[in-house]
């Protein structure tokens, strides 16, 4: 359904996986899909395809420039080596590309590392991002300009998640004291990455289905 494309990134060129809906389903809405710490792997491409089946134009930028991880140790190294300033340019470029295609503000949706970057991109691009979804997001090097956030945030969290869950109280406090619109859900009995069906040891079908329904509802409401 999708293909790799090139797009502008701060005067340079970035790449990403673009999935386009069929004409009979197209909503004229765009979603930036942001990778887990594994990189732009097949799972993330399938998520972009899944959005296209729902009628959204979806672009998943390749933040690791072609690198992917085969083990948690490799993934952690790639996550920590990520240049946040360069990632910000890639995310802005993806937002701008989708806004050009759709003619309107877009959404950001991210998983794991990408969950933090979804919120980061929404904070950094308030005029261009109208909805934000965070799946169990975290990244130790990302700092958020919460004052700049305009998009309503949907947070999807696992019950058992030492990586991401320390962020829940912080995000709620920062969003709440600024009267930002947000809605958080924690899925009982789940672990980090419960949406990733390539990881049977953590995948939870019921939580994946329910969280996807909430994601689509959120995007439909605000885009």
Indicate residue ranges for each PLM-predicted region.
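Serine-hydrolase catalytic machinery in alpha/beta-hydrolase-like enzymes
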Residues: 4-101, 195-199
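Hydrophobic residues in well-ordered beta-strands that form the structural core
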Residues: 59-60, 134, 184
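Short beta-to-alpha linker loops that shape the active-site pocket of alpha/beta-hydrolase fold enzymes
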Residues: 63-66, 138, 190
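Primarily recognizes the serine-hydrolase "nucleophile elbow" in alpha/beta-hydrolase
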Residues: 94-150
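Short beta-strand/loop motif that positions the catalytic acidic residue
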Residues: 149, 155-157
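Conserved alpha/beta-hydrolase "acid-adjacent" motif
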Residues: 162-168
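C-terminal catalytic histidine-bearing segment of alpha/beta-hydrolase fold enzymes
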Residues: 176, 181-223
